[in-house]
């Protein structure tokens, strides 16, 4: 049978008073007192200083800072790009700078050690700082400005020149080309670097190796890369070829440095117009990429969702996605030309209900779209991961665009794993994403994993270093605080839930799987908002009860008389005294179900202004009768003649209606009787039943066949092949898996599409239940792998977070 309970092994000590229903009133309002097992939300000594200090900041202050970043993007200045813009001469005279404000800003922003760039006490000298410093020196020398600054800058480069030759040091994209190009420019201006000629020769040797190396991508990708780092080639570059990459806004790749170099060599009016707009907007400094508002904001939205705090910024997120949607509809280059931006925009827009089709992703349908790009030349793992995740948001099994993207991106990611060239963190991320599809992950587990691996990233690297989202430290601090406060709520709920189990005498049932921690884990992992305590407890209680009476009907030691007695009692409901109990087991199971569902119905009536009791009882009766049919099939060794006969009963015996639907009435939304009878609601429930049954069957068929039970895998093998040979069983399993996946695609379309009478939060509950099924039944029956399941339960409810200290960021530019 389908274990409708999503639970496993192990219990924790029972404490607290006894209650029969849901949460007592005092637990439904606000957060309960802290519980010491997760005090602080993190283990001592695990959090960096900045985040630790932010944790004591009031939640509202953190939210205000994040909200400001969502409303107005702040970009960090790039000294490298600013230096190149500073080198552009006046339109009418090559003897004067076109952008003197950039020169002035460079003069005012040299560090005490003579360097320029993203530099702080927490960062050692790196190639980006070396590159930015030499670029600023060359820019100043070109206009004979700041001789003292130039001297200090040259001394810094000389002292740290070995960094440029260190192949283990993280390098900006194309560093060997751009750095050697600056050395050539400096030499042509009469500047002498205080380094040995052999060291300079080594830099040009590294440049030669980079230009000759067999990198990823194709000839087209190589041309695009060479154009992207065109400033490193100077007059040796074919600038007419480079200008083929000019965008509508006049830039090349939205890169100020590449565009500035093109302006110097071609005097193209559109490049100068782009640089004019850039300097008019930012003044002296310029960012490493512009525009990147949409990408930056989408990254922030994604970070908020991945860490579980997006609901606090619903209005701001909607504004950002509305803007992105308009850009998408107008086919704007900022979104459509950049692979990761386009992929992330599609994923977020689609999951938030915007009406977009995968047709706009068709230009990425073939692997050549990646191979021919700069991302392909660099074999960019992050871009491939974004494409692979996006490919999973299919609304139709016939969507060949997303299917193709998923196929080739997965293939390239697997090749990267085999190459052993990925960093430890990148390898871990790729392995995880490939192993666990989006529909087999649980929200709160994902939040924890993402919080613990969250990279505040003091700087990122393109051709030069720059800071990503400047709200990342606040995001992490708020996420840690929210996760901690949520855990304290879950822990109080668990204490109450354990006392409820004991009060119901469920622990006296020898045949039943009674595991409060695991059951409540599945509830907290999906209905995770602390304020939804009632909905969470209803799910835990109903899930536990359905598990118990699933075991009741599944247990060979329970007689047919007892099973019939239970069904008769449920049918009589309030008049059950007319029937009586034929055993202690029946009495315990019935009263646990009766008392709990009775209270759920009464509380739901207060929230919905209508009675739902008849529906609750009807669902309980239907599932009990369907379980009885399965028990009879097993006892008589009956095999249904068709899959239709099997599924018509199996969909009901899963009893999903009895534990997925009751929590819907406690989400703070009204669900009318008409809503519950609507086609959309019926389809959501039907798909949940089908997915639950098929996914369970595909993973538990071995032991069910041995136990003489009917299973869709067995039935499919008999129907298609007429036998149960290992080959037939494997073929049947593949078909069942495919059917489950197909139903999941249909479910995704229903949940993520706007329209229909069912509110999105209610539709999400069906989606989350299907994810629970895939999570617990992805590799054999989860009830038989207690260690991993218990670890996951502890991670959500009990164990403190473990964080990695972050670096810091420099000042910002408002966009």
UniProtKB/Swiss-Prot annotation:
Reaction(s) catalysed (UniProt annotation): ent-copalyl diphosphate = ent-sandaracopimara-8(14),15-diene + diphosphate; 9alpha-copalyl diphosphate = (12E)-9alpha-labda-8(17),12,14-triene + diphosphate
Triggers of expression: Induced by UV irradiation.
> How is the cofactor bound, in the record's words?
Binds 3 Mg(2+) ions per subunit.
Primary role: Involved in the biosynthesis of oryzalexin A-F phytoalexins. Catalyzes the conversion of ent-copalyl diphosphate to the phytoalexin precursor ent-sandaracopimaradiene.
Q: Which family does it belong to?
A: Belongs to the terpene synthase family.
Q: What's in the misc comment field?
A: ent-sandaracopimaradiene is a precursor of the phytoalexins oryzalexins A-F. Phytoalexins are diterpenoid secondary metabolites involved in the defense mechanism of the plant and produced in response to attack (by a pathogen, elicitor or UV irradiation).
Protein name, as recorded: Ent-sandaracopimara-8(14),15-diene synthase, chloroplastic
Q: Which organism is it from?
A: Oryza sativa subsp. japonica
Question: Taxonomic classification, please?
Answer: Eukaryota, Viridiplantae, Streptophyta, Embryophyta, Tracheophyta
Q: Which gene encodes it?
A: KSL10
